[in-house]
Amino acid sequence: MAQHFSLAACDVVGFDLDHTLCCYNLPESARLIYNSFAQFLVKEKGYDKGLLTVTPEDWDFCCKGLALDLEDGNFIKLADNGTVLRASHGTKMLSAEALAEEFGRKEWKHFMPDTGMAFRSGKYYFYDNYFDLPGALLCARVVDSLTKQNNGQKPFDFWKDIVAGIQHNYKMSAFKENCGIYFPEIKRDPGKYLHTCPESVKKWLRQLKNAGKILMLITSSHSDYCRLLCQYILGNDFEDLFDIVITNALKPGFFSHLPSQRPFRTLENDEEREALPFLDKPGWYSQGNAVHLYELLKKMTGKPEPKVVYFGDSMHSDIFPACHYSNWETVLILEELRGDKDGKPEESEPEEKKGKYEGSKAKPLNTSSKKWGSFFIDSVSGLENREDSLVYTWSCKRISAYSTIAIPSIEAIAELPLDYKFTRFSSNNSKTAGYYPNPPLVLSNAGKLTAK
Protein backbone atom coordinates (compact mmCIF):
# COMPACT_ATOMS: atom_id res chain seq x y z
CA MET A 1 0.00 0.00 0.00
CA ALA A 2 1.22 3.49 -0.83
CA GLN A 3 2.56 5.48 2.10
CA HIS A 4 0.59 8.57 1.17
CA PHE A 5 -3.05 9.44 0.53
CA SER A 6 -4.29 12.24 -1.73
CA LEU A 7 -7.78 13.48 -2.49
CA ALA A 8 -6.65 14.15 -6.05
CA ALA A 9 -6.36 10.38 -6.57
CA CYS A 10 -9.98 9.79 -5.50
CA ASP A 11 -12.88 9.65 -7.94
CA VAL A 12 -15.62 9.93 -5.33
CA VAL A 13 -15.74 11.88 -2.06
CA GLY A 14 -18.47 10.96 0.42
CA PHE A 15 -19.47 12.61 3.68
CA ASP A 16 -21.41 11.81 6.80
CA LEU A 17 -23.47 14.78 7.98
CA ASP A 18 -23.80 15.05 11.77
CA HIS A 19 -20.50 15.99 13.45
CA THR A 20 -18.70 15.73 10.10
CA LEU A 21 -19.97 18.34 7.63
CA CYS A 22 -22.38 19.70 10.22
CA CYS A 23 -20.59 20.83 13.38
CA TYR A 24 -22.66 21.29 16.52
CA ASN A 25 -22.27 23.65 19.45
CA LEU A 26 -21.45 20.67 21.66
CA PRO A 27 -22.26 22.06 25.12
CA GLU A 28 -25.72 23.12 23.92
CA SER A 29 -26.47 20.05 21.79
CA ALA A 30 -25.32 17.72 24.58
CA ARG A 31 -27.71 19.33 27.05
CA LEU A 32 -30.54 19.11 24.53
CA ILE A 33 -29.93 15.42 23.80
CA TYR A 34 -29.65 14.62 27.51
CA ASN A 35 -32.87 16.50 28.31
CA SER A 36 -34.78 14.85 25.47
CA PHE A 37 -34.08 11.43 26.99
CA ALA A 38 -34.32 12.41 30.66
CA GLN A 39 -37.72 14.06 30.22
CA PHE A 40 -39.02 10.94 28.51
CA LEU A 41 -37.74 8.60 31.23
CA VAL A 42 -39.17 10.74 34.04
CA LYS A 43 -42.52 11.67 32.48
CA GLU A 44 -43.30 8.52 30.49
CA LYS A 45 -41.49 5.78 32.42
CA GLY A 46 -41.58 7.04 36.00
CA TYR A 47 -37.86 7.39 36.64
CA ASP A 48 -36.40 9.55 39.43
CA LYS A 49 -36.87 13.30 38.84
CA GLY A 50 -33.29 13.82 39.95
CA LEU A 51 -32.25 12.78 36.44
CA LEU A 52 -33.50 16.14 35.17
CA THR A 53 -30.82 18.09 37.06
CA VAL A 54 -27.27 18.03 35.68
CA THR A 55 -24.32 19.97 37.10
CA PRO A 56 -21.34 21.13 35.01
CA GLU A 57 -19.18 18.64 36.90
CA ASP A 58 -21.43 15.75 35.85
CA TRP A 59 -20.35 16.14 32.23
CA ASP A 60 -16.82 15.02 33.05
CA PHE A 61 -18.17 11.47 33.05
CA CYS A 62 -18.65 11.62 29.28
CA CYS A 63 -15.78 10.05 27.38
CA LYS A 64 -15.77 8.48 23.94
CA GLY A 65 -14.70 4.85 23.73
CA LEU A 66 -16.60 3.51 26.75
CA ALA A 67 -18.65 0.34 26.72
CA LEU A 68 -21.75 -0.08 28.88
CA ASP A 69 -22.51 -3.57 30.14
CA LEU A 70 -26.30 -3.52 29.98
CA GLU A 71 -26.81 -6.24 32.58
CA ASP A 72 -24.50 -5.17 35.39
CA GLY A 73 -24.48 -1.39 34.80
CA ASN A 74 -20.70 -1.14 34.51
CA PHE A 75 -18.97 1.26 32.14
CA ILE A 76 -15.71 -0.11 30.76
CA LYS A 77 -12.60 1.43 29.20
CA LEU A 78 -10.71 -1.22 27.23
CA ALA A 79 -7.04 -1.64 26.42
CA ASP A 80 -6.07 -2.68 22.92
CA ASN A 81 -5.84 -6.31 24.06
CA GLY A 82 -9.34 -6.35 25.55
CA THR A 83 -8.39 -6.04 29.21
CA VAL A 84 -10.13 -3.46 31.39
CA LEU A 85 -8.18 -0.25 32.11
CA ARG A 86 -10.84 1.60 34.08
CA ALA A 87 -14.43 0.94 35.03
CA SER A 88 -17.33 2.48 36.89
CA HIS A 89 -20.60 1.22 38.28
CA GLY A 90 -22.97 3.92 37.14
CA THR A 91 -21.02 7.12 37.73
CA LYS A 92 -19.01 5.64 40.63
CA MET A 93 -15.48 4.82 39.53
CA LEU A 94 -14.06 1.49 40.68
CA SER A 95 -10.87 1.61 42.74
CA ALA A 96 -7.76 -0.26 41.56
CA GLU A 97 -8.55 -2.97 44.10
CA ALA A 98 -12.17 -3.32 42.99
CA LEU A 99 -11.06 -3.30 39.36
CA ALA A 100 -8.60 -6.14 39.98
CA GLU A 101 -11.21 -8.13 41.87
CA GLU A 102 -13.94 -7.63 39.25
CA PHE A 103 -11.90 -7.97 36.05
CA GLY A 104 -8.36 -9.09 36.86
CA ARG A 105 -5.92 -9.04 33.94
CA LYS A 106 -8.14 -11.11 31.68
CA GLU A 107 -10.10 -9.98 28.64
CA TRP A 108 -13.47 -8.38 29.25
CA LYS A 109 -16.13 -11.08 29.00
CA HIS A 110 -17.67 -9.66 25.81
CA PHE A 111 -14.38 -8.88 24.06
CA MET A 112 -13.61 -10.40 20.68
CA PRO A 113 -10.82 -9.09 18.46
CA ASP A 114 -12.08 -6.37 16.14
CA THR A 115 -14.45 -7.71 13.50
CA GLY A 116 -15.84 -10.36 15.82
CA MET A 117 -17.16 -7.78 18.28
CA ALA A 118 -20.07 -5.61 17.26
CA PHE A 119 -20.34 -2.11 18.66
CA ARG A 120 -23.86 -2.84 19.78
CA SER A 121 -25.46 -6.04 20.98
CA GLY A 122 -28.11 -7.12 23.44
CA LYS A 123 -25.45 -7.24 26.15
CA TYR A 124 -23.40 -4.06 25.71
CA TYR A 125 -23.28 -0.69 23.96
CA PHE A 126 -20.23 1.30 22.84
CA TYR A 127 -20.26 5.09 22.99
CA ASP A 128 -18.12 6.34 20.12
CA ASN A 129 -19.48 9.73 19.02
CA TYR A 130 -20.72 13.02 20.43
CA PHE A 131 -24.33 12.30 19.59
CA ASP A 132 -24.20 9.25 21.88
CA LEU A 133 -22.27 10.71 24.80
CA PRO A 134 -25.11 12.47 26.66
CA GLY A 135 -26.83 9.08 26.74
CA ALA A 136 -23.81 7.62 28.52
CA LEU A 137 -24.16 10.14 31.34
CA LEU A 138 -27.91 9.53 31.54
CA CYS A 139 -27.52 5.74 31.65
CA ALA A 140 -24.84 6.02 34.33
CA ARG A 141 -27.14 8.15 36.47
CA VAL A 142 -30.00 5.70 35.87
CA VAL A 143 -27.74 2.92 37.18
CA ASP A 144 -26.96 5.06 40.25
CA SER A 145 -30.67 5.57 40.89
CA LEU A 146 -31.65 1.93 40.38
CA THR A 147 -28.73 0.69 42.48
CA LYS A 148 -29.92 2.87 45.34
CA GLN A 149 -33.55 1.74 44.94
CA ASN A 150 -32.81 -1.97 44.55
CA ASN A 151 -29.90 -2.29 46.97
CA GLY A 152 -27.53 -3.15 44.15
CA GLN A 153 -29.64 -5.98 42.76
CA LYS A 154 -28.74 -7.07 39.21
CA PRO A 155 -29.32 -7.59 36.31
CA PHE A 156 -30.55 -4.21 35.15
CA ASP A 157 -33.45 -3.89 32.73
CA PHE A 158 -33.52 -0.18 31.86
CA TRP A 159 -32.19 -0.42 28.31
CA LYS A 160 -35.62 -1.08 26.81
CA ASP A 161 -36.71 2.31 28.17
CA ILE A 162 -33.67 4.01 26.60
CA VAL A 163 -34.57 2.44 23.26
CA ALA A 164 -38.15 3.67 23.69
CA GLY A 165 -36.77 7.16 24.30
CA ILE A 166 -34.76 6.98 21.08
CA GLN A 167 -37.85 5.90 19.18
CA HIS A 168 -39.95 8.68 20.73
CA ASN A 169 -37.49 11.46 19.94
CA TYR A 170 -35.94 10.30 16.68
CA LYS A 171 -38.42 8.09 14.82
CA MET A 172 -38.87 8.88 11.14
CA SER A 173 -42.05 10.89 11.67
CA ALA A 174 -40.79 12.82 14.72
CA PHE A 175 -39.49 15.82 12.77
CA LYS A 176 -42.73 16.30 10.83
CA GLU A 177 -44.92 15.67 13.88
CA ASN A 178 -42.84 17.86 16.23
CA CYS A 179 -42.61 14.82 18.47
CA GLY A 180 -40.35 14.79 21.52
CA ILE A 181 -38.01 17.59 22.52
CA TYR A 182 -35.03 17.38 20.17
CA PHE A 183 -36.42 18.26 16.72
CA PRO A 184 -38.82 21.01 17.86
CA GLU A 185 -35.96 22.74 19.67
CA ILE A 186 -33.53 22.50 16.73
CA LYS A 187 -36.23 23.91 14.44
CA ARG A 188 -36.99 26.72 16.89
CA ASP A 189 -33.40 27.94 17.24
CA PRO A 190 -30.92 26.22 14.88
CA GLY A 191 -28.28 28.87 15.51
CA LYS A 192 -28.08 27.86 19.16
CA TYR A 193 -27.05 24.33 18.27
CA LEU A 194 -25.45 24.41 14.82
CA HIS A 195 -22.35 26.04 13.35
CA THR A 196 -22.57 27.20 9.75
CA CYS A 197 -19.89 25.76 7.47
CA PRO A 198 -16.90 28.10 7.13
CA GLU A 199 -16.51 29.70 3.72
CA SER A 200 -13.27 27.75 3.32
CA VAL A 201 -15.19 24.47 3.53
CA LYS A 202 -17.86 25.60 1.05
CA LYS A 203 -15.13 26.71 -1.35
CA TRP A 204 -13.34 23.36 -0.87
CA LEU A 205 -16.52 21.41 -1.72
CA ARG A 206 -16.93 23.44 -4.91
CA GLN A 207 -13.25 22.90 -5.68
CA LEU A 208 -13.71 19.13 -5.40
CA LYS A 209 -16.73 19.26 -7.68
CA ASN A 210 -14.94 21.46 -10.22
CA ALA A 211 -12.07 18.96 -10.21
CA GLY A 212 -14.50 16.32 -11.48
CA LYS A 213 -15.05 14.48 -8.22
CA ILE A 214 -18.42 12.88 -7.53
CA LEU A 215 -19.68 14.23 -4.18
CA MET A 216 -21.97 12.18 -1.95
CA LEU A 217 -23.78 12.79 1.31
CA ILE A 218 -24.60 9.58 3.21
CA THR A 219 -26.37 10.13 6.53
CA SER A 220 -28.57 8.12 8.85
CA SER A 221 -30.58 11.27 9.54
CA HIS A 222 -33.97 11.41 7.83
CA SER A 223 -34.49 13.59 4.77
CA ASP A 224 -36.43 16.39 6.50
CA TYR A 225 -33.83 16.84 9.24
CA CYS A 226 -31.00 16.54 6.71
CA ARG A 227 -32.56 19.32 4.63
CA LEU A 228 -32.88 21.63 7.64
CA LEU A 229 -29.24 21.04 8.63
CA CYS A 230 -27.84 21.46 5.13
CA GLN A 231 -29.84 24.60 4.37
CA TYR A 232 -28.60 26.15 7.61
CA ILE A 233 -24.93 25.16 7.35
CA LEU A 234 -24.44 25.30 3.55
CA GLY A 235 -27.28 27.42 2.17
CA ASN A 236 -30.48 26.76 0.24
CA ASP A 237 -28.54 25.66 -2.83
CA PHE A 238 -26.75 22.84 -0.97
CA GLU A 239 -28.15 20.19 -3.32
CA ASP A 240 -26.06 21.68 -6.13
CA LEU A 241 -22.94 20.53 -4.27
CA PHE A 242 -23.84 16.84 -4.14
CA ASP A 243 -24.39 14.40 -6.97
CA ILE A 244 -25.89 11.82 -4.62
CA VAL A 245 -27.72 12.32 -1.30
CA ILE A 246 -28.65 9.27 0.77
CA THR A 247 -30.70 9.79 3.93
CA ASN A 248 -31.95 7.28 6.50
CA ALA A 249 -28.96 5.22 5.40
CA LEU A 250 -29.18 3.10 8.56
CA LYS A 251 -25.41 2.80 8.90
CA PRO A 252 -23.51 0.56 9.51
CA GLY A 253 -26.02 -1.75 7.80
CA PHE A 254 -25.71 0.39 4.67
CA PHE A 255 -22.22 -1.08 4.24
CA SER A 256 -22.70 -4.58 5.66
CA HIS A 257 -26.14 -5.62 4.37
CA LEU A 258 -26.85 -7.34 1.08
CA PRO A 259 -28.83 -5.36 -1.52
CA SER A 260 -31.82 -7.65 -1.01
CA GLN A 261 -31.82 -6.82 2.70
CA ARG A 262 -31.58 -3.06 2.27
CA PRO A 263 -32.77 -1.75 -1.12
CA PHE A 264 -32.74 1.92 -2.00
CA ARG A 265 -36.08 3.70 -1.85
CA THR A 266 -37.37 6.77 -3.63
CA LEU A 267 -38.63 9.77 -1.66
CA GLU A 268 -41.76 11.83 -2.16
CA ASN A 269 -42.36 14.76 0.20
CA ASP A 270 -39.92 13.15 2.65
CA GLU A 271 -41.92 9.91 2.64
CA GLU A 272 -40.23 6.69 1.56
CA ARG A 273 -41.78 5.10 -1.51
CA GLU A 274 -40.98 2.18 -3.78
CA ALA A 275 -37.97 -0.09 -3.37
CA LEU A 276 -35.54 0.05 -6.29
CA PRO A 277 -33.94 -3.09 -7.78
CA PHE A 278 -30.82 -1.00 -8.57
CA LEU A 279 -29.68 2.62 -8.90
CA ASP A 280 -29.61 3.90 -12.45
CA LYS A 281 -28.94 7.61 -11.89
CA PRO A 282 -27.69 10.10 -9.29
CA GLY A 283 -30.21 11.83 -7.05
CA TRP A 284 -31.68 11.81 -3.54
CA TYR A 285 -32.56 8.39 -2.09
CA SER A 286 -33.40 6.75 1.22
CA GLN A 287 -31.91 3.64 2.90
CA GLY A 288 -29.95 1.54 0.39
CA ASN A 289 -26.67 -0.34 0.33
CA ALA A 290 -23.06 0.23 -0.67
CA VAL A 291 -23.10 -2.53 -3.31
CA HIS A 292 -25.75 -0.90 -5.51
CA LEU A 293 -24.20 2.52 -4.87
CA TYR A 294 -20.81 1.31 -6.08
CA GLU A 295 -22.37 -0.06 -9.26
CA LEU A 296 -23.78 3.41 -9.95
CA LEU A 297 -20.38 4.97 -9.24
CA LYS A 298 -18.79 2.65 -11.80
CA LYS A 299 -21.33 3.83 -14.35
CA MET A 300 -20.86 7.52 -13.48
CA THR A 301 -17.05 7.41 -13.57
CA GLY A 302 -16.68 4.93 -16.42
CA LYS A 303 -14.15 3.07 -14.28
CA PRO A 304 -14.28 -0.60 -13.19
CA GLU A 305 -12.94 0.27 -9.72
CA PRO A 306 -13.55 3.94 -8.86
CA LYS A 307 -11.64 5.07 -5.77
CA VAL A 308 -13.92 6.28 -2.97
CA VAL A 309 -13.04 8.17 0.21
CA TYR A 310 -15.58 8.64 3.00
CA PHE A 311 -15.42 11.21 5.81
CA GLY A 312 -17.15 10.39 9.11
CA ASP A 313 -16.96 10.81 12.88
CA SER A 314 -18.17 7.40 14.06
CA MET A 315 -15.91 4.36 14.05
CA HIS A 316 -19.00 2.16 14.42
CA SER A 317 -21.22 3.69 11.75
CA ASP A 318 -18.76 5.24 9.30
CA ILE A 319 -15.10 4.30 9.44
CA PHE A 320 -14.99 0.60 10.29
CA PRO A 321 -17.80 -0.52 7.97
CA ALA A 322 -16.72 1.67 5.02
CA CYS A 323 -13.18 0.30 5.33
CA HIS A 324 -13.98 -3.32 6.23
CA TYR A 325 -16.97 -4.06 4.01
CA SER A 326 -16.49 -1.63 1.10
CA ASN A 327 -12.72 -1.17 1.07
CA TRP A 328 -13.11 2.60 0.83
CA GLU A 329 -10.51 5.07 2.01
CA THR A 330 -11.70 6.62 5.27
CA VAL A 331 -11.08 9.97 6.96
CA LEU A 332 -11.98 10.02 10.65
CA ILE A 333 -13.16 13.35 12.06
CA LEU A 334 -11.63 13.28 15.53
CA GLU A 335 -12.49 16.29 17.68
CA GLU A 336 -9.98 15.12 20.30
CA LEU A 337 -7.23 16.45 18.01
CA ARG A 338 -8.53 20.00 18.46
CA GLY A 339 -7.23 20.21 22.01
CA ASP A 340 -3.59 19.79 20.97
CA LYS A 341 -2.55 23.36 20.29
CA ASP A 342 0.16 23.93 22.86
CA GLY A 343 3.04 22.11 21.26
CA LYS A 344 4.31 20.49 18.11
CA PRO A 345 5.65 16.94 18.06
CA GLU A 346 8.89 16.42 16.17
CA GLU A 347 7.21 14.66 13.25
CA SER A 348 4.52 17.29 12.68
CA GLU A 349 3.81 18.69 9.23
CA PRO A 350 5.86 21.71 8.08
CA GLU A 351 4.06 24.98 8.80
CA GLU A 352 3.90 26.05 5.17
CA LYS A 353 2.03 22.86 4.23
CA LYS A 354 -0.68 23.15 6.82
CA GLY A 355 -4.29 23.93 6.07
CA LYS A 356 -6.27 26.31 8.21
CA TYR A 357 -6.35 24.73 11.67
CA GLU A 358 -8.49 26.55 14.19
CA GLY A 359 -6.54 25.50 17.26
CA SER A 360 -7.66 28.61 19.14
CA LYS A 361 -11.33 27.66 19.07
CA ALA A 362 -13.04 26.70 22.29
CA LYS A 363 -12.23 23.11 23.15
CA PRO A 364 -15.15 20.77 22.43
CA LEU A 365 -17.17 19.28 25.24
CA ASN A 366 -15.22 16.65 27.15
CA THR A 367 -12.48 15.75 24.72
CA SER A 368 -10.72 14.64 27.88
CA SER A 369 -12.11 13.40 31.16
CA LYS A 370 -10.64 13.51 34.65
CA LYS A 371 -12.50 10.32 35.49
CA TRP A 372 -11.51 8.33 32.42
CA GLY A 373 -8.20 9.83 31.31
CA SER A 374 -6.96 9.91 27.74
CA PHE A 375 -9.01 8.56 24.85
CA PHE A 376 -5.77 7.28 23.29
CA ILE A 377 -3.64 5.72 26.05
CA ASP A 378 -3.83 4.81 29.71
CA SER A 379 -1.76 3.17 32.41
CA VAL A 380 -2.42 -0.36 33.54
CA SER A 381 -4.11 -0.17 36.93
CA GLY A 382 -1.72 -0.53 39.83
CA LEU A 383 1.36 0.10 37.70
CA GLU A 384 1.07 3.87 37.39
CA ASN A 385 4.67 4.51 38.41
CA ARG A 386 6.14 2.21 35.79
CA GLU A 387 6.94 3.88 32.50
CA ASP A 388 6.24 0.75 30.46
CA SER A 389 2.75 0.37 31.94
CA LEU A 390 1.22 2.74 29.37
CA VAL A 391 -0.88 0.94 26.77
CA TYR A 392 -3.00 1.91 23.79
CA THR A 393 -6.74 1.93 24.28
CA TRP A 394 -8.95 -0.26 22.11
CA SER A 395 -10.38 2.90 20.54
CA CYS A 396 -6.92 4.17 19.62
CA LYS A 397 -5.98 0.84 18.07
CA ARG A 398 -9.05 0.92 15.83
CA ILE A 399 -8.22 4.42 14.58
CA SER A 400 -4.92 3.29 13.10
CA ALA A 401 -6.42 -0.01 11.90
CA TYR A 402 -9.41 1.33 9.95
CA SER A 403 -8.78 5.03 9.21
CA THR A 404 -6.71 6.22 6.27
CA ILE A 405 -6.07 9.47 8.14
CA ALA A 406 -7.61 11.27 11.14
CA ILE A 407 -8.24 15.03 11.22
CA PRO A 408 -9.82 17.40 13.78
CA SER A 409 -12.31 18.83 11.27
CA ILE A 410 -12.87 19.28 7.56
CA GLU A 411 -11.90 22.92 8.01
CA ALA A 412 -8.43 21.76 9.05
CA ILE A 413 -7.69 20.57 5.49
CA ALA A 414 -9.94 22.86 3.44
CA GLU A 415 -7.15 25.20 2.33
CA LEU A 416 -4.69 22.48 1.36
CA PRO A 417 -4.21 21.72 -2.34
CA LEU A 418 -6.22 18.70 -3.47
CA ASP A 419 -3.02 16.88 -4.40
CA TYR A 420 -1.58 17.31 -0.90
CA LYS A 421 0.00 14.02 0.18
CA PHE A 422 -1.13 12.94 3.65
CA THR A 423 0.88 10.29 5.46
CA ARG A 424 -1.55 7.42 5.98
CA PHE A 425 -1.98 4.96 8.79
CA SER A 426 -0.50 1.61 7.78
CA SER A 427 1.32 -1.34 9.28
CA ASN A 428 4.52 0.06 7.74
CA ASN A 429 4.21 3.42 9.52
CA SER A 430 4.13 4.39 13.17
CA LYS A 431 0.79 4.36 14.97
CA THR A 432 0.83 8.16 14.94
CA ALA A 433 1.57 8.57 11.22
CA GLY A 434 -1.98 9.23 10.01
CA TYR A 435 -2.94 12.03 12.40
CA TYR A 436 -3.14 15.45 10.74
CA PRO A 437 -1.93 18.13 11.39
CA ASN A 438 -0.18 16.53 14.38
CA PRO A 439 -0.48 13.34 16.38
CA PRO A 440 -2.20 13.74 19.75
CA LEU A 441 0.37 15.16 22.16
CA VAL A 442 -0.35 12.39 24.63
CA LEU A 443 0.82 9.84 22.04
CA SER A 444 3.82 11.87 20.91
CA ASN A 445 4.97 12.40 24.49
CA ALA A 446 4.41 8.82 25.62
CA GLY A 447 7.36 7.37 23.75
CA LYS A 448 7.19 3.69 22.95
CA LEU A 449 4.03 2.21 24.40
CA THR A 450 3.32 -1.35 25.33
CA ALA A 451 1.34 -2.80 22.43
CA LYS A 452 -0.44 -5.99 23.37
Swiss-Prot record:
Gene3D superfamilies: HAD superfamily/HAD-like. It holds the Pfam family 5_nucleotid. InterPro entries: HAD-like_sf, HAD-SF_hydro_IG_5-nucl, HAD_sf. The active site is at D16 (nucleophile), D18 (proton donor). Residues 339-365 are annotated as: Disordered. Its EC number is 3.1.3.-. Mg(2+) binds at D16, D18, D313. One of its GO terms (molecular function) is 5'-nucleotidase activity. The keyword Metal-binding applies. Keywords: Acetylation, Hydrolase, Magnesium, Metal-binding. Residues 339-361 have a biased composition (Basic and acidic residues). Belongs to the 5'(3')-deoxyribonucleotidase family. PANTHER family: 5'-NUCLEOTIDASE DOMAIN-CONTAINING, 5'-NUCLEOTIDASE DOMAIN-CONTAINING PROTEIN 1. This is 5'-nucleotidase domain-containing protein 1. It comes from Bos taurus. The gene is NT5DC1.
